[in-house]
Amino acid sequence: MSGAVQTGNLVNITTAGTIASGDNTIRLSRIVSKVKFTIKAAKEEGITRSFKLDTYDIMNIAQEGRLIGNNDGNDRIEAEKVNNNIGNTIGVNDVEAGAQFFEVYLPENLQTKVKSVNSQAAREDDSQTKPQKVFTNAPAKGTYVVLKGKYEETKNGTTRSADVTYYVHLGDCTKDVDYYDVERNCKYTYNITVAGVDKIIVEALKQNEEYQPGAEGVVLEYGAKGKNMTLDSHYEYMVMRFYQNDIQELKKAGKGYYYQVYALGNHTDVINVGATTTGNKNNVDTSWIQFAIKNSVYSEDKSDRGTACNYPGTKSSDLYDVESFLKYLYSNATNSLIWKGYDNIKGHYLDATCFISENYYKNLKWNQYVNDVDKRAFYVANEVETSKDGRSVYAKTQYGLIQYNIQTFYDRSKAGSITAYGCETINDEEGKDFSVNGRGSKYNSSGNDTWNGRANMLKDIEKDDWESLKSNESLIKACMSRNRDLNGDGKISDDEIRWYAPTISQYIGIWIGEEIMSTEAKLFNRSTSTLERESDRMLYYSSTNNQNTYFSEEGMATNNYPTQNYPPKLVRCLRNLKSYNEGYNYEPDKYYTYNTSESTVTLDKVDEKALNTSGELGELNEHEERSAGNKPAKSFRIAAKTYPENNSGDASMESVVYGRFKCYGNYNEGDRKWRVPNQREMSVMYLINPDLINMAYCRTKFSNINFRKSWTYTSVFTMATNWSDYSSGKVCCIKVLK
């Protein structure tokens, strides 16, 4: 904070630290502003809407400014140096009154309009003429927020689904839409209500109505025919049905099927495959989309992918790329032999499996296709139109699919030098007819690798054949379903296993880096406030053979079923990431480095946004598991012994959590640089030496204190339901290193 006497009169400070004259009080003010965004879908009778915020970016954050604000007599100084904060996500508990929200503190940034406007929408206008987002009316260095998420709307049996992007310039625009200043000591609240994608549609249709330049995205509209699906980053498929009458009508009009592909931030033209193919691919990779016809069965259920045919093998003549398949339909429009299906409404049809490759590029650095890179997508339609800037597409699609990116918490700036691992996004097991559904898995991995889950998967495959794995009560088969029989020989061999079940050590990495990954990819995507013993829990399978259950709702808790309660019912499969390589058979680098001689651990391969890099020393304030207080220090030293050594004294769990126990008061010669670890730091200490933290406590409390209190370790990570059960224990102190 900063402050000054507004009158300019002399201020006398007494030896007691008080101001001699009450008329000349120094009034302090915050040098930053507080900005809050709430985002929700509009409610309307007869329409079902949902919006889920994926990430938010804060652009043009001022890097410098005055200590004292722009008071009378001071010249207005506009920020020249700015930077960006990209790819932020919100937590599972960041919901109030049904709306998602986030709050940030931003430095003052005073900026002047470029051109006057008369509406909120015009503030975000970029005239749609630039390949990059360059605003026409807003100042070039004005602070703005980019909201990215998924919108879905159902009305009268027709569903629209959109990956949308909203741009919101900050400033008090309620009093003046030309106002872009972010002033210190002010609170700004922006309530965003997503009421539809119509403005995006207007852009795409190029109608003479006012478009909404602050909103962009891909808009799909599908109704009685066809479907749109979101698929995960592993190997996927979707069965599509094509009607003979449709291609015959297109052919009469001198056209064929339209398609468009989005990948790696670029997209093809809207390509028409008829007598000739029109439209450019623009160097966009389309090889990840393939078709096969034999024994495919389409499902009318819009949430069901259908029954795929067997993958014929990458070198099989039965496999088509996009253009050759659509050309095949065009060329055989009148050939009744291929249109083997029939229904009474639409006539003859052909069912084909669209095989989607894993979202992995062996010819690129892995940072080029993970996390918040634009998702890749594929659309097949009779009619497609795009906005003039190419940023929005409106398609009355017959079929459309969007594929998630692999999510990782590893430092993407080191993609050229380290092998990482990433995870899928969707919990495929929820609501699916796996044998583990309801009862959970009784299966323990046959592997004994505590780090590399793929090594354990290979041991499991060695023990059981594929047929037995499909029928037993395990989640191994769930991970096998993420892989593909690439050579078409009828089995998934060792060199075809790309996706595997994590070890506990790998789950800990995902927990440490939760903030880095998308909102949808978080292992626990519900609220902890409603947790009960049996409800709202999300239990994941681990390939660590003595800890096969990971409790995602508790952040870091484990057990071993069936020797303990709670069988795992979900699994979040992993994929190893290595630049310019297929990478699947490389062991991922550990995300931490431990110096044995110095007893120091450094999270040197974790994205720094997941870490506490401040280097601040001393005890932590009270905090919960998903708050900033539970970010682990990037580097810290682990004490050689615990206190008290005999689990006696005042180190109860409650006293540690609420700060009555302090490391500097009891340990290491009163050095105030030592402190109690938070929960994530204690998880890292488990990776180094589990025995060191046996019956040890941490500073972090659980966000639902009525459900669980805090954490400890007794052969597995566990949580207390009552303080009295943990009246004595110990603490392994740490010292943060800069």
Describe the predicted segments one by one:
Residues E383-R484, N576-G670:
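Active-site microenvironments of metalloenzymes and redox enzymes
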Residues V182-D232, L574, N581-T596:
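Intrinsically disordered, low-complexity repeat and linker tracts
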Residues M1-I19, S161-T189, T386-K432:
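Short beta-strand elements
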Residues M1, L10-S29, K34-R184, A308-Y311, ...:
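Tryptophan-paired
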Residues L231-Y349:
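Surface-exposed binding patches on compact interaction domains or structured appendages
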Residues I476-D485, D494-R498, I504-N576, V657-R675, ...:
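An exposed tryptophan-centered "aromatic clamp" motif
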Residues D489:
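Acidic carboxylate motifs that coordinate Ca2+ or other divalent cations, activating on Asp/Glu
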